[in-house]
Swiss-Prot record:
This is UPF0324 membrane protein NE0724. Its main location: membrane. The chain crosses the membrane at residues 19-38, 71-93, 100-119, 139-161, 181-200, 204-226, 269-291, 350-369, 389-411, 426-443, 456-478. It is found in: Cell membrane. GO terms for cellular component: plasma membrane. The keyword Membrane applies. It comes from Nitrosomonas europaea (strain ATCC 19718 / CIP 103999 / KCTC 2705 / NBRC 14298). InterPro entries: UPF0324_pro (IPR018383).
Length: 487
């Protein structure tokens, strides 16, 4: 292990994983302060649905909890608060602070411009809202269009304006943005847990079972394919198998460290993970909506088992949630509550993430005592699992259970807490999703696939020929017939 990992608290101020926890907890504590009469939320801006013919600042933006504020003031405060917090984190993580600040500001402006455009009624409004906005036509794409538009803009920058992309890379941190949003998503899950405790329990338990069954199939099949068909070395097959079977980049890096693989391997696999995650993000939400519009929880769970980065999974889950709810309202006459399909995807993904440390530990033991046959060369302990464990999961669980305990203290406390949290949670989480989409596009460079033909071919075959079909089958077995609450 390196020096950074010699203490349990190492990295708490220097890693994106931990800073996702700190930023999420800061926002959660701002919400909790409402219980003592402090109003520290409500300043967050959020876009509103609007039409081209009636464009105005007041029409496209609004304050999430302070209606007396001008929307421009809410947007300015939103920028100042998040700029201060992210720059503090960037300084602590030893980023180039000046470059991060400039890049963050550019990303923030682009994100909000795209978000506002994506909320134009011709793009977003459902068929039931046409009369409300005076529309004669509309695409009824829902909020998912904003995410897709952000991704497309990012891809254009990442592949056609590469100097700009390289400059923005210091601020384009999709994994950090999405992990921060997921930590705060814990409060939304807390609300859902109180509203539908039985359903949450069933979803969590079936999610654990589905994840375990799927993973026990994924890794050995992909590893065997890599070794016997593609004739990869043991370390290459192991790193790629973990990357595509567990959770992408984190698993590839953890596995490489555990088995002491060649340094280039996790880098190659990470590139493949990011690029293929982009394809999954674009294809799978619409595909699942089309093939099984009446199985929302199956689709969400299958997405969580298939998409291999936290950022892309959360982003794809948000898009799937929007697409399936819009489709159900338009074609089935059912209005599902927001967030439950996304939660099915994230819950499954989080169980997979929690397995990283355990699997890295198992592989380390196998490599030391079986593959390398050099006992005593490496000392494996519980601290290894701790340092591999995704810390944002701890933040997510802490916020989730803390909200439940605080809200359970009385109906008045629950109402106060919910009002204060809702003023920040939804807009903040969605803004982080938007930042994730545009950042994924910016860091995705298709030209980097050159020279990785064998690994790329194996990754594609394993993903679409093994992982996706098995994931959907397992999700179908464990989640078939489960439905989100109806409004």
């Amino acid at each position: 292990m390196n020096a950074m990992n010699d203490k349990w608290y190492s990295g708490m101020a220097r890693t994106e994983d931990w800073w996702a926890v700190w930023l999420g907890l800061i926002m959660f504590m701002a919400s909790v302060s409402s219980l003592w009469g402090w109003e520290l939320t409500g300043w967050m801006a959020k876009p509103d649905t609007w039409v081209w013919e009636k464009f105005s600042i007041e029409g496209v933006l609004k304050s999430s909890g302070k209606p007396e504020w001008h929307p421009a003031l809410s947007l300015l405060v939103t920028y100042l608060v998040f700029t201060a917090l992210t720059c503090l984190a960037a300084w602590s993580m030893k980023f180039d602070l000046k470059q991060f600040f400039i890049g963050w500001t550019i990303l923030f402006i682009m994100t909000w411009v795209i978000w506002i455009i994506g909320n134009e009624a011709h793009f977003k409004a459902s068929v039931y809202e046409m009369d409300k906005y005076g529309l004669s036509w509309g695409l009824s794409l829902g909020s998912g269009f904003s995410y897709l538009l952000a991704l497309l803009v990012g891809l254009v920058i990442g592949n056609f304006f590469k100097n700009t992309a390289r400059f923005l890379n210091e601020a384009a941190k999709p994994e950090w943005f999405i992990k921060t949003a997921i930590v705060f998503l814990g409060i939304k899950i807390g609300v859902m847990s109180i509203e539908a405790a039985g359903f949450i329990t069933e979803l969590v338990m079936t999610g654990v079972a589905a994840t375990f069954v799927a993973y026990m199939l994924f890794w050995p099949i992909v590893y065997a394919l890599g070794r016997r068909v593609f004739h990869l070395s043991r370390d290459a097959a192991a790193v790629l198998s973990s990357g595509i079977s567990i959770c992408g980049i984190s698993a590839a890096i953890a596995t490489a460290g555990a088995i002491r693989a060649r340094p280039a391997l996790p880098a190659f696999v990470s590139i493949l993970v990011v690029i293929f995650a982009m394809f999954e993000l674009i294809i799978l939400p619409g595909f699942y909506t089309a093939i099984a519009p009446e199985q929302p929880i199956v689709n969400g769970s299958a997405l969580g088992l298939t998409v291999k980065t936290d950022g892309a999974d959360a982003a794809a889950g948000a898009m799937l949630d929007e697409l399936m709810r819009a489709n159900a309202e338009a074609n089935l006459g059912i209005v599902w509550k927001e967030g439950w399909i996304l939660m099915a995807s994230l819950t499954t993904k989080i169980w997979i993430d929690m397995f990283i440390g355990v699997w890295a530990f198992v592989l380390a033991l196998v490599w030391v005592y079986k593959v390398e046959r050099k006992p005593g060369q490496s000392k494996i302990g519980l601290m290894e699992i701790w340092h591999r464990f995704p810390k944002f999961v701890l933040g997510y669980l802490l916020v989730w259970f803390s909200y439940i305990m605080l809200a359970s203290s009385g109906s008045e406390a629950a109402e106060t807490l919910h009002k204060a949290a809702a003023a920040v949670e939804g807009p903040m989480r969605n803004m982080m999703f938007m930042l994730t989409f545009i950042s994924i596009g910016i860091i995705t460079d298709f030209s980097k696939l050159k020279g990785m033909g064998k690994l790329a071919l194996l990754y594609a075959i394993a993903l679409f020929g093994i992982i996706a079909p098995i994931a959907y089958g397992v999700a179908w077995i464990f989640h078939r017939g489960m439905m989100p609450p109806v409004l």
